[in-house]
Amino acid sequence: MKKFKNLLKQYKLDGYIIPKNDEYFNEYVNSAKDRLKFISNFSGSAGFAIILKNKNYLFVDGRYTIQAQIQSGKSFKVITIPKKFPKDVLKFNKKLTIGFDPKLHTESKLNFLFNIKNISLKSVNKNLVDVVWSKRPKKLIKPFYSLSKKNTGISSEEKILEVKKFFNKNKVDYLLVTAPENIAWILNIRGHDSKFSPIPNARLLMNKNGDIHFFTNPKKITMIKKSLTKKIIFHEENKIEKILTNLYKNKIFLDSLSCSIYYKNLLKKKNIIVEKIDPIHFFKSIKNITEIKNMKKSHLSDGAALTKFLFWIKKNFRKRKITELFAQKKLENFRKMNKSYKFPSFNTISGSGPNTAIIHYRASPKTNRSLRKGDLYLVDSGGQYSFGTTDVTRTISLDNNTKLDSNYSNRRR
């Protein structure tokens, strides 16, 4: 933290914003990109920090207030949104210059949070956390993989033709796709870039003719290159800056919710920008017959694993010691019996007794309770399958508690 605050002086800043998200605005970021956890020790899925010269603030929503206070310790003052916003704590008589990394913020969100009279925002292209993060975890690179029409119902070529109609209606020259989940949809590919979601970290630039420039690490495309349309031109991740800079007098559509300030600034110098929600969100939301069948299939598969697990709990909790963490692992093992299972869809909530009342509780060696007679046991979990995603919450009574207790606990979820 001392090194970081020295950088504030070096860059003539009064403070610096550190968000949870990575450059792709993913909810779940890998350890090599979790700058907020590195600086604050907070491991929740949402939040941001403001580091000032003499004080540090950690902003989270109500799900994470207790967790943030425990993990960040005395180094940070935890602020719960929406009870308070940055404008409520940055009330100083003097003007403050607050720095930010333009690749980690959208204009709309930054303006919403920091449209404050005494605050001057300063874009800093070098990420200051990265400068002081010497023992950074290694970034694992795994190749993307393709989904067959059996799982998607519609080929990538058909999806591209559908999106092409959007160009004609809106009279734009290019569509910049910056949301990884939308790239996954249009190209029928998946990846390993997020711990709980099979999204591919990449960017895509499509023109009105259906030609696509695809930007990502070359090591990630080895398994998908042959299966994709020949209209796709593959580029290294960092080549996007050069290609965007060279676009001139074009009408370019971008999503203000997922396009960073950095890329927007590259484009708006020489082009006309149209900022709306990425049309792929709309196309993606209309599920075809195959997708609907696969959704049902994924819940039947997951339901079988969960049913076996709950039966196992009821049968064994009196006979042997079952802790929250052991139960969590056992559920994962039941899911793994299905060959189509990939990995969890989020951090499992496995809580017993008083821990069921903690929002977004995550069992740890320190909090790991044994399941006891008379407890309520709550499990909120999900799985990623090759054909769908699940998210299921169940509360069971371990003996004497009534149905009413279970209803109350489920409502808290």
Predicted segments — roles?
Residues M1-R413:
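Active-site neighborhoods and metal-handling regions in enzymes and metal-associated proteins
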